[in-house]
């Protein structure tokens, strides 16, 4: 059982995740799929791994790059939008953004977009000239405008950006968009994409203590193994040996399949393959059409290359 009063151990890995928000559940699911077991009480901001020397800190997402930059945490799971905003903020203050982006992760996808009111006539980025644009990402927006030679006023808000035009605080907004439903509810529409974002794994710039290095390597390997197989399927089937060339062409995104002779059937084989693309019903029907039988499709939970 986790002990919330326990003091941090300097030889235990510390990983920062968003306390509450769109990345929280997916971040914790990723760690669980990597084998981490922990207990978390209500409002508990630090959890201790029960089967790994790894502790999870629950913090505001925009604090995660700072904690990793300052070596308070060894690793962080955070949105690329936050990482890019912090890099530019550090650079503006003359601070080298030393934390390293280790891996792009397959969740938390969204776009940082310019959105305009429904009645606004948008004719390209030059339509932003002289406008007031509300955002919580002033550095990313500022760079976007500067790169295009656009002079506009950046209005910095900490939240509820979508309502700024209706309140007269801004003409347009620059905010994260996932489905677009919030924009529509506030009579806004997408005009320009500033940044494509997703969750990323970042790492401290400070050399990790020897006691932590092995578990860091193992955790990164496990994360890679979990991410590799998202959407992958394991296919098993029986087929005539003569049908192997046709079957190999039909298996989506697979390496060379494993072919196993069937006992007492010299003309038939079992075929096993990991497919890294979606396997649709049409694929199964085509496999059956070239002679495959007993076709079985299984999800792949994890894989080490």
Regions found by a protein language model. Give the residues of each.
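Short, structured active-site "lid" loops
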Residues: 53-75
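Signature of uroporphyrinogen-III synthase
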Residues: 66, 111-115
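Small-molecule-sensing regulatory modules
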Residues: 2-54, 78-106, 111, 120-305
């Amino acid at each position: 059982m986790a002990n919330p009063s326990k003091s941090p151990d300097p030889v235990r890995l510390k990983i920062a995740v968003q306390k509450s928000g769109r990345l929280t559940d997916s971040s914790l699911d990723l760690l669980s799929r990597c084998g981490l077991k922990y207990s978390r009480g209500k409002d508990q901001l630090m959890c201790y791994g029960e089967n790994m020397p790894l502790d999870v800190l629950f913090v505001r997402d925009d604090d995660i790059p700072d904690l990793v930059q300052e070596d308070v945490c060894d690793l962080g799971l955070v949105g690329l939008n936050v990482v890019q905003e912090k890099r530019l903020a550090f650079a503006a203050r003359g601070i080298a953004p030393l934390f390293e982006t280790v891996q792009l992760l397959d969740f938390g996808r969204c776009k940082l977009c310019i959105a305009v009111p429904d009645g606004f006539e948008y004719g390209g980025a030059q339509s932003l000239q002289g406008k007031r644009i509300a955002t919580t990402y002033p550095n990313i927006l500022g760079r976007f405008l500067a790169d295009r030679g656009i002079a506009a006023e950046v209005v910095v808000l900490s939240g509820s950006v979508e309502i700024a035009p209706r309140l007269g605080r801004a003409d347009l907004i620059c905010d994260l968009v996932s489905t677009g439903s919030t924009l529509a509810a506030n009579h806004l529409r997408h005009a320009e994409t500033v940044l494509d974002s997703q969750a990323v794994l970042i790492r401290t710039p400070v050399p990790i203590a020897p006691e932590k290095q092995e578990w860091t390597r193992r955790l990164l390997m496990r994360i890679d193994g979990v991410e590799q197989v998202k959407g992958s399927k394991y296919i098993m089937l029986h087929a005539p040996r003569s049908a192997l060339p046709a079957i190999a062409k039909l298996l989506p995104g697979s390496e060379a399949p494993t072919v196993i002779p069937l006992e007492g059937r010299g003309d038939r084989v079992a075929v096993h393959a990991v497919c890294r693309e979606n396997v649709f019903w049409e694929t199964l029907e085509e496999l059956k059409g070239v002679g495959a039988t007993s076709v079985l499709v299984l999800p792949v939970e994890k894989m080490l290359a």
